Curated annotation (Swiss-Prot):
One of its GO terms (molecular function) is structural constituent of ribosome. InterPro entries: Ribosomal_bL28 (IPR026569), Ribosomal_bL28/bL31-like_sf (IPR034704), Ribosomal_bL28_bact-type (IPR001383), Ribosomal_bL28_sf (IPR037147). The lineage of its organism: Bacteria, Bacillati, Cyanobacteriota, Cyanophyceae, Nostocales. The gene is rpmB. This is Large ribosomal subunit protein bL28. Pfam families: Ribosomal_L28. NCBIfam families: L28. One of its GO terms (biological process) is translation.
Amino acid sequence: MSRRCDLTGKKANNAFAVSHSHRRTKRLQQVNLQNKRVWWPSGNRWVKLKLSTKAIKTLEVKGLEAMAKEAGINLNHY
């Protein structure tokens, strides 16, 4: 399974770890993903999604169906 948000598509970012002497080595900044069970009212059931914490906050404002429509995903497959 990929470390990617189901609704926003967020994934890891390439960055540098910078030491005190300013030597730079490559590292990954991972997305803060949470396995979340979300109630889907029109489907009348729970849906298990892997969401970033930013997506969870946005979900409370927009709602599940609006975000799924924007992402172009079919909730019947989850």
